[in-house]
Amino acid sequence: MRAATQVLGCRRVALIDVDAHRADGSENIFAGDASVLLLDSFQATAFPYGVAPATAANVTNMPLDDGTLGREALARMEAEWLPRLYDFAPDLIVLSIGFDTHYEDTQTLLKFSEFDYAYLTRLVMRAAHDLCSDRLVSIMEGGYNKKALARSVLAHVGTLVQ
């Protein structure tokens, strides 16, 4: 994020983090930084445990209950995050996507599918097109089920290159 503002000249950067684990490190770094918007979804019962409220106005946490379906999470993201993202009007969007939310991943308890990852990717790509001339960085975080991870990465990257 700092490189985007310092090197690329971006005034505002949005970080969208979809993962089974809370982006507490990112939140600790960027809380209170008006040049960064952090939108974070995570499994409420995954480490680090707890559903503490966001620590600053530029942070939106979306804890997800165990068993939350991808389509349910995506509906919430569209309703709660998109207005915030469009109001923020970033110069760059960073999508940090963890495939440990997949329903076949036995280490976590969320129920996303590869179709959900493709939908999320399209949603963020559309926002990047509308807001920041398609400036989008994708960071893939991983997952624990190798077969589900492979299909999920393929769905995500395949959508990015369409």
Regions found by a protein language model. Name each.
Residues 102-107, 135, 145-149:
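Short active-site-adjacent structural elements
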Residues 1-130, 157-158:
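Conserved alpha-helical scaffold segments that buttress catalytic/binding sites
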Residues 113-114, 146-162:
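Short, electropositive alpha-helical surface patch
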